[in-house]
Amino acid sequence: MTSAFDLTGRLAIVTGARRGIGFAMAEALAQAGADIIGVSATLEASGSAIEQAVTSHGRRFEAIACDFADVDAIAALGERLAVRPVDILVNNAGTIERAPAAEHPIELWDRVIQVNLSSQFVLSQAVGRSMLERGHGKIIFTASMLSFQGGVNVPGYTAAKSGVAGLTKALANEWAGRGVNVNAIAPGYIATDNTQALQDDPARSRAILDRIPAGRWGVGADLGGATVFLASAASDYVSGIVLPVDGGWLGR
């Protein structure tokens, strides 16, 4: 009997696939049988670590380099991907800029909103149209703990990730009845480049660990199961959720 989690023959786009959470998501999808189109701001045409990881599982990998802060580049990427028979879109690319709200430059605000929210809507719209025409598809956003909480010194990031949670629900309301499931994963405190400043701050890191019932920072592989679930037939009746993968952070 075929597993409901089997992704053999599926084509998945994963943005921000070069490292961190996106790398782990792409590899998990490949392990489940999907071929991968990896998109990142800087991604080698061949020979990248993520290509090696995907092909080690016997799956095909295609690399696309795209600057998510560039409005024109994102529009062109959407047009390029819209003609592909994409089954799964993982909107994971993101950035973070830290500064107190009273001093936060508008240029940084605009960049974070563009990369973390606007570009993801453009890609979802372009790829989503094709999915709607075919009557099936899975779209997964990477949300955040700051889709639920306010954070400190990251006003643009919090606004963007709150927007991602809202966009997930908005698209799900329109598309669930047409065969396209739209959901989000909200990682907790995961040990990646984006959280390096927190990991390097002994007091802040200790405070974070004290609140996580699991007692540790998450790692990219912790997102794999949730990603495969939301990308597979196992989640066909799941739409509009923001699924925390946080070691219990929000339950504390």
Predicted segments — roles?
Residues 11, 18-19:
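Conserved glycine-rich cofactor-binding loop
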Residues 34-49:
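Conserved glycine-rich Rossmann-like NAD(P)H-binding loop of the short-chain dehydrogenase/reductase
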Residues 100-101, 108-113, 208:
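Substrate-binding pocket helix/loop in short-chain dehydrogenase/reductase
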Residues 121, 178, 216-250:
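C-terminal substrate-recognition "lid" of short-chain dehydrogenase/reductases
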Residues 124, 160, 168:
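Active-site helix of classical SDR
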Residues 129, 173-177, 236:
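Alpha-helical segment proximal to the catalytic Tyr-Lys
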Residues 144:
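Residue(s) in the substrate-gating loop at a strand-loop-helix junction
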